[in-house]
From Swiss-Prot:
Its cofactor is Zn(2+); Co(2+). Its main location: cytoplasm. GO terms for biological process: arginine biosynthetic process via ornithine; L-arginine biosynthetic process; lysine biosynthetic process via aminoadipic acid. One of its GO terms (cellular component) is cytoplasm. Catalyzes the release of L-lysine from [LysW]-gamma-L-lysine and the release of L-ornithine from [LysW]-L-ornithine. NCBIfam families: dapE-lys-deAc, PRK00466.1. This is [LysW]-lysine/[LysW]-ornithine hydrolase. Pathway: Amino-acid biosynthesis; L-lysine biosynthesis via AAA pathway; L-lysine from L-alpha-aminoadipate (Thermus route): step 5/5; Amino-acid biosynthesis; L-arginine biosynthesis. It is found in: Cytoplasm.
Length: 346
C-alpha cells in the first residue's frame, strides 16, 4: 500500500509540474498537445483530440472522468516545496486532471476501461463540454474533476445567463444636454440589480459598461453586460423578462447560457464517491456551488453524475494556487475506489 502511494505521488509530481509549465488559458489548449501525446504513449491510452475545441480524450469505456485543461489567465511559475506544488491551475483544475489521468491509467491496468478528458474552455464558455455532448457520446457514469477540498461531493450548481444590452440615444453637447444615456441606464441598472446573497436567490450583476467617445458630448451608444445566476428552482424566463421590461428601448441578446444542474443524493456516482471517502476514513459532505462547471453541460449525456476533486476550492483563480501530493493521492484513490464499485455493479 505504501509502495503504491509513493508511486502515485512520484508520478503525480512529475506529470503535474510538466503540465503546469504549459500555459493553457482558455482557447490556448493546443499548447498541451505534446503532453497528452506523451501520456497516451506512456500509459497506453488511446488519444482523441476533438477538432472544434481542441479537447483531449484518453482511453475508452462507458465511465468518464472529466476535468479541464484550460486555466484562467496569468502564468505562475511552477515549483515544489516540501511536497506542495504551486502554479497556475494546480488547484483549478490541473491537479484534479492529473489525479484522474493516474486513476484511469491504474484502472485500465486492472482491466477496468475508463475514459478521461482534459476538456477545453471550461473557464470561458465550455466549448469542450458542449462539443463532447454533440459527438454522440453517452456514458453510464461521469465524475467531473473540480477542486472540492478532497472531501466535498458537489450535487448542485446554479445556472448562468450572459446578456448583452445595447442602448442608443441622441448625442448632445454636455454643457446643455437635456438627457444622458449613462445617467438613464445607470438608474435602470440599480433598479434591476440583484446582489448575490444566498444560493436560492437569483443574482443579476452588471459586469461591463462602455459608453461615450468625447469629453464634451453625451453618448450616442451604450453597451452593458449582465451576468445572471439562478438556482434550479428559480424561473429563468421571469428573470429575462424582468430585464427586458426594464430595458425596453434597448436591444437585448443572450450570448451564452448554461442550465442549472441538481442530482439526487441516491445517484450512483454520489453514492460511490461517498463510500470511497468513507473507506479512507474521510467524512464526505454533499454540497452545492453558486457558480457553474462542465457538470451543468455533461448532465445531458448521462443519468449518473457528480463533481469531486482534490484541491482547496478557496484557492481557485488566485495567485496562491497550490496543492499537496497527499491531496492528489487521495483524489486518485477516491476516483479508483468509486469507479471500481461502479464497474462491479454495471
Amino acid at each position: 500500500m505504501q509502495q503504491e502511494k509513493e508511486l502515485v505521488k512520484q508520478k503525480a509530481k512529475e506529470l503535474l509540474l510538466d503540465l503546469l509549465s504549459i500555459y493553457t488559458p482558455s482557447k490556448n489548449e493546443t499548447n498541451a498537445t505534446k503532453f497528452f501525446e506523451k501520456i497516451s504513449n506512456e500509459f497506453n491510452l488511446k488519444l482523441e483530440i476533438l477538432p472544434d475545441s481542441n479537447s483531449f480524450i484518453l482511453g475508452e469505456g462507458e465511465i468518464l472522468l472529466a476535468s479541464h485543461v484550460d486555466t484562467v489567465p496569468g502564468y505562475i511559475e511552477p515549483k515544489i516545496e516540501n511536497e506542495v506544488i504551486y502554479g497556475r491551475g494546480a488547484v483549478d483544475a490541473k491537479g484534479p486532471l492529473i489525479s484522474m489521468i493516474i486513476a484511469a491509467w491504474l484502472l485500465n491496468e486492472k482491466g477496468i476501461k475508463v475514459m478521461v478528458s482534459g476538456l477545453a474552455d471550461e473557464e470561458s464558455t465550455s466549448i469542450g463540454a458542449k462539443e463532447l455532448t454533440l459527438k454522440n457520446f453517452n456514458f453510464k457514469h461521469i465524475i467531473v474533476g473540480e477542486p472540492s477540498n478532497g472531501t466535498d461531493i458537489v450535487v448542485e450548481y446554479r445556472g448562468s445567463i450572459q446578456l448583452d444590452i445595447m442602448c442608443k440615444s441622441t448625442p448632445e453637447h454636455s454643457s446643455s444636454a437635456k438627457s444622458n444615456l449613462i445617467v438613464d441606464i445607470s438608474k435602470k441598472i440599480i433598479e434591476v440589480y440583484k446582489q448575490p446573497e444566498n444560493y436560492d436567490k437569483p443574482s443579476i450583476v452588471p459586469t461591463i459598461i462602455r459608453a461615450g467617445e468625447s469629453y464634451n458630448v453625451t453618448p450616442a451608444k451604450l453597451y452593458l453586460h449582465f451576468d445572471v445566476r439562478y438556482a434550479i428552482n428559480n424561473k429563468r424566463d421571469d428573470l429575462i423578462n424582468e430585464i427586458k421590461d426594464k430595458f425596453q428601448e434597448c436591444g437585448l441578446k443572450i450570448v451564452d447560457e448554461t442550465p442549472p444542474v441538481k442530482v439526487s443524493i441516491n445517484n450512483p456516482v454520489v453514492k460511490s464517491l461517498t463510500r470511497a471517502l468513507l473507506k479512507q476514513n474521510i467524512k464526505p459532505r454533499l454540497v452545492r456551488k453558486a457558480g457553474t462547471s462542465d457538470m451543468n453541460i455533461l448532465q445531458k449525456i448521462t443519468t449518473s453524475i457528480a463533481t469531486y476533486g482534490p484541491g482547496n476550492s478557496m484557492l481557485e483563480h488566485t495567485n496562491q494556487e497550490k496543492i499537496t501530493l497527499d491531496e492528489i493521492y487521495i483524489g486518485v484513490k477516491t476516483y479508483m475506489l468509486a469507479i471500481e464499485e461502479l464497474w462491479q455493479k454495471s
